[in-house]
Structures are given as C-alpha cells and as structure tokens.
Amino acid sequence: MADSAVPYSLGPSARASSTHRVATGTKQTSALKRRDASKRQAELEAALQRKVESERRAVRLVEQLLEENITEEFLKECGMFITPAHYSDVVDERAIIKLCGYPLCQKKLGVIPKQKYRISTKTNKVYDITERKSFCSNFCYKASKFFEAQIPKTPVWVREEERPPEFQLLKKGQSGCSGEVVQFFRDAVTAADVDAYGAFDAQCEPASSSTWSERASDERASDEEGPGFVSSLLPGNRPKAVGTKPQPHRQSSTVKKKAAQKMTSKHGEQTVSEVTEQLSNCRLDSQEKVATCKLPAKKENTQISSPGPLCDRLNTSTVSENKHSVSQVTLVGISKKSAEHFRSKFAKSNPGSGSASGLVQVRPEVAKANLLRVLKDTLTEWKTDETLKFLYGQDHGSVCLQPSAASGPDEELDEDDISCQAQNTLDETLPFRGSDTAIKPLPSYESLKKETEMLNLRVREFYRGRCVLNEDSTKSQDSKENELQRDPSFPLIDSSSQNQIRRRIVLEKLSKVLPGLLGPLQITMGDIYTELKNLVQTFRLSNRNIIHKPVEWTLIAVVLLSLLTPILGIQKHSPKNVVFTQFIATLLTELHLKCEDLENLAMIFRTSC
C-alpha cells in the first residue's frame, strides 16, 4: 500500500515538470523555425540581389559594347556575363546608330536595302537578309553568328559555379554568307530512301486484288485529269521516305503498277539490289510507253513515231538515267488532254512534219495576195477629191484617168446584171427609191384645195391679229415642248477631233518607217514632213483603215513617197532617184513583191474618184 501511494502523491509535480519541458521544447522549436526562416529569407534576398546585380552588369556590358574600339579580350569577357538575347540587343542597337552589328568592327553602315530576300546568281539560292542588314559585310555577319553560338544559354546569375567557356573568334580572311538560306523544298530522294522503301515493302503482307484495282482506277482517273502541259522527266525533289510509314500514293504510277506487284509476289526473297534494278527497268519501260503512246485527234488517229524533240529528249534522258542514280528523276504520266495539247505544240515546232505543218504555215502567194488586197482597200478608202487636187492641182480631171465602167475586159453581163443596172438607174432618176412612201393613199383634189384655203385664211388672220388657235393644236404644241424638255439630246461627236487623232496616228506610224527610206535619197524627215502632213490631211480616215502591220506601213510609205517625189523636186533620172529605185527593188524582193505591184498601188491615186 505504501509503494502504491508514492506515485500517487508525486503526480502533480511530475505533471508540472512535463509541462515545463513541453513548453521549453516548443520555444526552442519556434526559435529554430524563426532562425531558419530568417536564414532562408537572407539567402533568398542574397540570390535576388545577385540576380539583380547580374542583370545590371549585363545591361552595362551591353551599353559598353555599343561603343567603338572594342577589343577581342573585352568581347570574350563579356560573353561570360551575357546571354544570346543580350547580344541580339547589342546588334540591333548598333544597327540603329548606323554601326556594324559586330562589336569588333568599327565601320559605318551604308545604304540599307529595303528588300527582305536576296537571290544569288552564283549559288542559285535565295537568302533572307533580315539579319544581314545589320552588318557591313558577310564576314562580320558570319563572325557575329559564330560568337553568338558560343554564348551560354543558362541564366547569368547561376554561372558563378560553372566553368567559364573558351570563346573563339573568326579571323579575317575567312569567307562569310549572305544570310540565311530559304528552303523552298526538302532534300531530293536518295538511293538509301529507295532501298529502305523496297526493304519495307518486301516485309509487308501482300496487298489484296481489290486494293490494287482501286489504286489502278485512281491512277486512271488522275491520268484523265492531268495537267495542261507535260514534262517527260522532272528532278526528284520529293520528301524523304520515312522508315516506318512509307506513302505509296506519292510514288510514281509505274512503281505502283509493276514493281509493287513483283515485290508482293516474292515477299522477302528479293534483296535490295534486285528491287533497285526492277525500279530502273520499270522506269525505262514507262519511258518507252510515253514515247510510243497514241495521241487522240478529232479527225484521224495519229501516232508520234517520227524523230523529233520528244524522241531526242527521251533518248538523252534514258542515257542520263543509266549513268546516274535511279532515284534522281521521277516519271510523270501523260494524260489525254495533255497529249492533244502536246501534239499541237509538236506540229508547230516541226514545220516539215506532214499535214500538221500545212495548217500552220501560209504560202507566200496567199500572203502576198492578202497584203496587196489590204493595201489596195486602204488606199482606195483614203483617196478623196482633195487628195487629187493636192497632187495634181485644180484641173486634176484632165490629168487623172477615168475609172473603167466595165468590170473586166472579157467579162460578159448576163440578164440579171442588166436588170439590176436598169433598176439602179431608175432609182437614181426618181425622187424616191422604195415603196414605203406609197403605202398611204393620195389625198383628193378637193381636200387639198380646202386645206390650202384654210392655211391662207390663217395667215391673213395672223397678220391682222385675229388668229385664234384651236385647243387641239395648242395641246399638241405643249406636248411637243414637254417632250423636248423631257428628252434632252446629247451633244454631237466632234468629228474633226476624231480626224485629228487619226491623222496624228498615221503621221506617227509613217514617221517610224520613213527615216529608213529617206537614207538613199539623202534627205531628212523635216524636208518632207510639211508636204506629208498636208497630204494626210486630205485622206478619208476611219477607225479601221489606220490599223496596219509594220510591213504594210512600210509599203504605204513607199507609195506616198513616190507620189510626193515630183512635189519635192527630185528628178526621175537623178542619181539620188536611181539609188532609191535600187533600194526599193531590194525591199520588194525581200517581200516577194514586184515593181508592178507597187505601180498598181500608186495608180490608185492617178484615177478619179
């Protein structure tokens, strides 16, 4: 009992001591926490201070790099305390103040181009010169990019524990680049891609017949909807084949039809070399099909079998394909629409290729007849009485020939021509030519007499001041006035201004061809311009007879010059005229014309209108 009563009596003191120990431990723990928190805060403030100081130091270095006379050692030291973004700011700021973007260069920037791209004819590449504009030369641009690539990308405030990198600078004399190369397409298909594609197909399961039939139908549909023009061989600028998922739809149609069927039948028995050999054979066979394919025509079916540019191109492409790798070229199919278009182009390019060239070429006789007919019609429309008065004076009727009434010396008139001529002469004598005026019946004599008396009476009353108009007549006059007010007429076209424009056009065209004709005559354009202008002012010009080809204008100038020769005072048998005659004869020979043709054109101005 005594033993058990001792702890019971010590209970309050023990509880007090334990409470004191707990309170003491809590105070110590809180003190440690406050100490750790203050320590962490101090460390955080120190880290933040280092970060701010590092950023300030980087900004100061950026400002110092904007100055001139920067040494290599200083630039290398700055590379440890800046980032690529800071260096880009240095380049931009130096470009703004018209300094070269490379800190070691002290040159000024000249005229900065405004374009974004530059095409190099030496390398056949397109360069993006957006960043290149900030440098004075290609070397400075390359040296700057070389130094920028060595700058660490880590934050500047964590580099104290890192090992400083060893910066290297480009030496002078090393070539630079014009900018970043613009990639318009991916790399071409290589032999490794073809081998990988063949090995993967050899491991794949054989495709079903329905799949190949669907692909064949798709290829036929694509052939029918082919492009407008065809090139037999194109450089193989296609994407590289992926090793896991090749895309057979992007390959050539011949590879789908022949090589794929053979590879699926043999599975994995074929090697890579055999697959490559089969691909080359398929391409050669498809070339023969393109060379001997039948081209559709509307009237008759023809086949290109004669030697021409197409056959030569296919032969050369076949030889080059045997020499080079198979994967460097890609075959393009030919469609029906493209074949027809190519056949027309082939016919135009080969003048002696049968009946197709006969449709394109025009015989010299036909061209000569058309030329003379156009010139004759034009000069006939131009000729007026004023033209004859200017050339031959007021009494041109005695000098000029009368136009023949008969249509031809050996032509006989039939009954229809005689009746037509009689009808024409009758129409000229009568005051009216048609039967439209005789549709209404003629008024009687009594009605005409009464109408005449009424008119005389109204005239007498008008002079006496007693004339009173009827309501119907006044209404009709008012309605006519209203109609005139409602429907204003447009101003007439100034025909004289139109003629002035046409005369100016004719004089400009003649002024372009006359200097070459006036050389043998040893006269200038100013000597004949006044007479030529006066002659053109007498022409009857329209919007159709002033449009001619250069050859036609040359012949027109020759005709007009022959008409103005007497007015200019050039004698017929003078040495100048003899040289001019020889020159004109040479010109007519080149145009497949004769002197008689030129005389016939000049005879138009020697006949009366």
From Swiss-Prot:
It is found in: Cytoplasm; Nucleus. Residues 33-69 form a coiled coil. One of its GO terms (molecular function) is protein serine/threonine phosphatase activity. The modification Phosphoserine is found at residues 9, 222, 476. It is an enzyme of class 3 (hydrolase). It holds the Pfam family RPAP2_Rtr1. The modification N-acetylalanine is found at residue 2. It comes from the Eukaryota. Keywords: Acetylation, Coiled coil, Cytoplasm, Hydrolase, Metal-binding, Nucleus, Phosphoprotein, Protein phosphatase, Transcription, Transcription regulation, Zinc, Zinc-finger. A zinc finger (RTR1-type) spans 77-160. Zn(2+) binds at residues 100, 105, 136, 140. Belongs to the RPAP2 family. Protein phosphatase that displays CTD phosphatase activity and regulates transcription of snRNA genes. Recognizes and binds phosphorylated 'Ser-7' of the C-terminal heptapeptide repeat domain (CTD) of the largest RNA polymerase II subunit POLR2A, and mediates dephosphorylation of 'Ser-5' of the CTD, thereby promoting transcription of snRNA genes. Downstream of EIF2AK3/PERK, dephosphorylates ERN1, a sensor for the endoplasmic reticulum unfolded protein response (UPR), to abort failed ER-stress adaptation and trigger apoptosis. This is RNA polymerase II subunit B1 CTD phosphatase Rpap2. It comes from Rattus norvegicus.
